[in-house]
Amino acid sequence: YADAVARATPAVVNVHTAKVITRRVHPLLNDPVFQQFFGDRFARSRKEIQTSLGSGVIISVQGYVLTNNHVIEGADEIQVLLNDGRSARASVVGTDADTDLAVLRIDLDKLPSIVFGNSDNLRVGDVTLAIGNPFGVGQTVTFGIISATGRDRLGITAYEEFIQTDAAINPGNSGGALINAHGELIGINSAIYSRSGGSQGIGLAIPISLAKGVMTQIIEQGHVVRGWLGIEAHDMTPELAESFDLSFAHGMLINGVMRGG
């Protein structure tokens, strides 16, 4: 699978973020008795730089980078490091918390870009390769298979149809590429099921079929628009049917209409 890896790795990047956080002091440090001896040097709030890392995928030569929303959420500065050693500051084009996706943009010449595969035709047992920056050690490739498709009801995001793989995915892999045996992008590595914090053989990736629709809307209009009914509804029960003098007990009761619905 070296050819597949060689085809995809130039387009997989490391994403480094930094944000300024304010550390609040312990209430005890504001105690007048404490300050009598030590003054207020310990009582002042402190600003610190918090850094984190993740991965991303260059999806076009125009410099668009697809990653996870949780990788860059709240960041004051985002730096993208390419496999060829170049780096650039990234701007946020848009994010979608409901799918945990984000699109960044970098301004560099002669950029590589990933080739999209088809995640709708995946079968359990197909070979997969995960590419990312686990624990910040540098670009790493792991091997596995498709363990399941369409994983949902996991409580991770609002819209879920995850690809499950046993290719090792660890902290730092988030936003990186899940590719097939041809080096084509089939998913964005997003989460793991683990009690230890490291890989235990259950990695989850957002299928590219879902990600493409989200990233297209973000690039074209800066955000994602979804249809909604705007109603409050309740399943019909035999008790409700009787109270409304209905001869059937199936369907849905509309309790109310939301503003704009």
Regions found by a protein language model. Give the residues of each.
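Serine-dependent protease modules
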Residues: 1-260
